[in-house]
């Protein structure tokens, strides 16, 4: 795995804006590597990291996008390299601010540059409602912030990936063709009065998955939306005491926290071709949280 480590370190430097050009040998390897290539947004930590690790374990190259935490992203890349079964797998780090058009617009180009191709896109990056204000107190600034990251970014990133796929018919290294994944939330269906903007953004992701599914089906691309429930990550550590009794009390019928690996394994299964006749669907990963109970 020494080669993987060298590539990770190189790509980390490249992603931080180094003017160093990519050595021809490294670029040639990226262009001719056998593993499928996947971009996972927001994969330096949390659910996205869980996805990246599962894909790495299954033999895929993964471009690890992140916004700010260099150390966490580097650690994720190193963990991916350690568990990768194929020495040809690559785990470049791509740093981009999804709040900004420049960050969104260049992400697919960066992924294609360092991976040489793109067989799947996993839209995972997202933010919660700033301040978690009540519906009657939500500000326009907070609304715009949530929509920019949770809706505008995946829309235009997916659009750019889809254009590349349409231009490269039949070239996917994944069984069943290219794949587009949206990691959403049960909040697409379940309302929270202090996170109204967030819930609306996740509901919008559901329709986004449907329209891309309809547009790309004839081009050999499958689309799916995964809706995680209450997940145990570093970002939910501060509310663990609040949710433990809720989960144990049966609000989540399976009575446990969801794990990043639960999302990662679902994404891996879809990318590996285990759902060959599925597109445009919303699949819940919530232990039954969304199910109505009389």
Residue locations for each model-derived region?
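Short C-terminal tail/terminal secondary-structure segment
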Residues: 132, 250, 268, 279-294
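Residue(s) in the substrate-gating loop at a strand-loop-helix junction
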Residues: 185
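Short, small/polar-rich loop/turn modules that mediate ligand/substrate recognition or access, typified
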Residues: 122, 217-222, 278-280
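Active-site helix of classical SDR
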Residues: 158, 201-204, 209
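Alpha-helical segment proximal to the catalytic Tyr-Lys
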Residues: 163, 214-215, 276
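Conserved glycine-rich cofactor-binding loop
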Residues: 42-46
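Substrate-binding pocket helix/loop in short-chain dehydrogenase/reductase
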Residues: 132-135, 139-147, 248
């Amino acid at each position: 795995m020494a080669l993987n480590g060298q590539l990770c370190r190189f790509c980390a430097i490249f992603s931080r804006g180094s003017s160093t050009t990519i050595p021809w040998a490294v670029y040639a390897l990226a262009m001719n590597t056998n593993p499928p290539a996947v971009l996972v947004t927001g994969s330096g930590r949390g659910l996205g990291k869980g996805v990246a690790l599962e894909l790495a374990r299954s033999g895929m190259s993964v471009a690890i996008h992140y916004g700010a935490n260099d150390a966490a992203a580097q650690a994720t890349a190193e963990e991916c390299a350690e568990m990768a079964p194929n020495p040809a797998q690559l785990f470049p780090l791509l740093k981009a601010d999804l709040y900004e058009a420049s960050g969104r617009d260049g992400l697919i180009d960066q992924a294609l540059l360092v991976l040489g191709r793109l067989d799947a896109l996993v839209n995972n990056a997202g933010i919660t409602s700033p301040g978690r204000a009540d519906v009657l107190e939500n500000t326009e600034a907070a609304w715009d912030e949530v929509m920019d990251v949770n809706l505008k970014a995946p829309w235009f990133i997916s659009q750019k990936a889809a254009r590349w796929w349409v231009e490269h018919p039949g070239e996917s290294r994944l069984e069943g063709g290219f794949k587009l994944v949206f990691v959403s939330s049960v909040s697409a269906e379940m309302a929270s009065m202090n996170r109204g903007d967030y819930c609306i953004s996740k509901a919008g992701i559901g329709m986004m998955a449907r329209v891309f599914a309809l547009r790309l089906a004839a081009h050999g691309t499958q689309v799916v939306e995964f809706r995680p429930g209450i997940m145990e990550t570093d970002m939910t550590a501060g509310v663990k005491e609040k949710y433990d009794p809720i989960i144990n009390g049966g609000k989540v019928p399976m009575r446990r926290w969801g794990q990043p690996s639960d999302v990662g394994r679902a994404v891996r299964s879809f990318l590996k071709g285990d759902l060959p006749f599925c597109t445009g669907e919303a699949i819940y990963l919530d232990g039954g949280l969304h199910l109505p109970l009389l």
